[in-house]
């Protein structure tokens, strides 16, 4: 039995959880999310708490106990508070702008990188180099932030590129000059 999986999920006011045989639906003030369940994982709503349990304590299902508890907890937190990721752009001439439903990135290439912003996400750009991605689906926020970062990941010699706010990038020493 998982230590995380045993913990109950408390439901704040305004959050509604519906459980069917194959999926869990969470509806809150910021939006609604659904998660499919595999056979053998049971979800019960008891008053103000959600409990995740296994049909039997098989080793095959034990992996999913903590996973589904965390996924449902992230759905509850997302529909009430939301999630946010911040990215920093470091480099001469690197800048970003939001144009309608596109994120326009100038990253030193001969062409601008235009990324479509997924539905359900809000993207804000401050000072042309700070990108804030927010939404109620943790997976979608993290995936889009990773997609933006992958356009120009930080390089190890000068540290130029797109990085998560607060991310530490190890720098390498440059090539030593040859002695004559």
Swiss-Prot record:
One of its GO terms (cellular component) is cytosolic large ribosomal subunit. InterPro entries: Ribosomal_uL6-like (IPR000702), Ribosomal_uL6-like_a/b-dom_sf (IPR036789), Ribosomal_uL6_a/b-dom (IPR020040), Ribosomal_uL6_bac-type (IPR019906). The keyword Ribonucleoprotein applies. GO terms for biological process: cytoplasmic translation. The keyword rRNA-binding applies. SUPFAM superfamilies: Ribosomal protein L6. Belongs to the universal ribosomal protein uL6 family. This protein binds to the 23S rRNA, and is important in its secondary structure. It is located near the subunit interface in the base of the L7/L12 stalk, and near the tRNA binding site of the peptidyltransferase center. PANTHER family: 60S/50S RIBOSOMAL PROTEIN L6/L9, LARGE RIBOSOMAL SUBUNIT PROTEIN UL6M. This is Large ribosomal subunit protein uL6. It comes from Protochlamydia amoebophila (strain UWE25). The gene is rplF.
